Amino acid sequence: MGGTTSTRRVTFEADENENITVVKGIRLSENVIDRMKESSPSGSKSQRYSGAYGASVSDEELKRRVAEELALEQAKKESEDQKRLKQAKELDRERAAANEQLTRAILRERICSEEERAKAKHLARQLEEKDRVLKKQDAFYKEQLARLEERSSEFYRVTTEQYQKAAEEVEAKFKRYESHPVCADLQAKILQCYRENTHQTLKCSALATQYMHCVNHAKQSMLEKGG
């Protein structure tokens, strides 16, 4: 003990699966072992046999180096953990932003779709209303046309009947006053006598007297019938 420094032979055994070394129950990585080898005094020697490493260092020095290397490894691990945590947070933020953008895009698309559907429904209702109004107007016009045709037919019938009745009345009226030549035979004889005796009309005086008597008799007969 005293001022002498005790030394012990420490064996570093390699782990085939995890590429680390066990030092008295402490698992060290190859990076730690390499740094320990590089920082060891020039008087220390390393030995290699069957994949194992040997090093002669003091117990205190070994503990110090192991503690330092473990602290470095821990700091490195914490730094890497912080980096991974930062990257994870950044990834989460990016994912959240992407999800928000996607949600907004879906919402905008949904709103646009709903607006388009609303416009389509409104247009359909307008077309239905216009079609209903047109059908109503068409039915009204057809009804009015039918009434006009009926009125025209009735007017034609009444007009025809009235015309026929008026024609019959006029015809009956004129038939009632229909006249025939009076004393037609004597009138013809007088005309013939006047043509034959142009310069001797007195020869026709006897026929003229008979014609006048015939006319007067006819007038008297008509007056008697009318009275």
UniProtKB/Swiss-Prot annotation:
Residues modified to Phosphoserine: 29, 50, 56, 58
Sites bearing N6-acetyllysine, chain numbering: 142
Q: Which UniProt keywords apply?
A: Acetylation, Cytoplasm, Disulfide bond, Host-virus interaction, Lipoprotein, Membrane, Mitochondrion, Mitochondrion inner membrane, Myristate, Nucleus, Phosphoprotein, Repressor, Transcription, Transcription regulation
Q: Where is this motif: Cx9C motif 2?
A: 204-214
Q: Which GO terms describe its biological process?
A: cristae formation; inner mitochondrial membrane organization; mitochondrial fusion
Annotated CHCH domain residues: 180-222
Q: Which PROSITE patterns match?
A: CHCH (PS51808)
Question: Main site of residence?
Answer: mitochondrion
Compositionally biased spans, kind Polar residues = 39-49
**Tissue-by-tissue expression:** Detected at low levels in brain, placenta, lung, liver, kidney and pancreas with increased levels in heart and skeletal muscle. Higher expression in primary lung cancers than in normal lung tissue.
Instruction: Enumerate the subcellular locations listed in this protein's record, separating them with semicolons.
Output: Mitochondrion inner membrane; Cytoplasm; Nucleus; Mitochondrion
GO terms under cellular component: extracellular exosome; MIB complex; MICOS complex; mitochondrial crista junction; mitochondrial inner membrane; mitochondrion; nucleus; SAM complex
Lipidated residue numbers (N-myristoyl glycine): 2
For this chain, the annotated S-S bridges are: 183-214, 193-204
Q: Which InterPro entries match?
A: MIC19/MIC25, MICOS_subunit_Mic19
Q: Where is this motif: Cx9C motif 1?
A: 183-193
**What does the function comment of this entry state?**
Component of the MICOS complex, a large protein complex of the mitochondrial inner membrane that plays crucial roles in the maintenance of crista junctions, inner membrane architecture, and formation of contact sites to the outer membrane. Plays an important role in the maintenance of the MICOS complex stability and the mitochondrial cristae morphology. Has also been shown to function as a transcription factor which binds to the BAG1 promoter and represses BAG1 transcription.
Q: Which family does it belong to?
A: Belongs to the MICOS complex subunit Mic19 family. Metazoan Mic19 subfamily.
| Name the UniProt record assigns to this protein | MICOS complex subunit MIC19
Organism whose genome encodes this protein: Homo sapiens
**Native organism taxonomy:** Eukaryota, Metazoa, Chordata, Craniata, Vertebrata
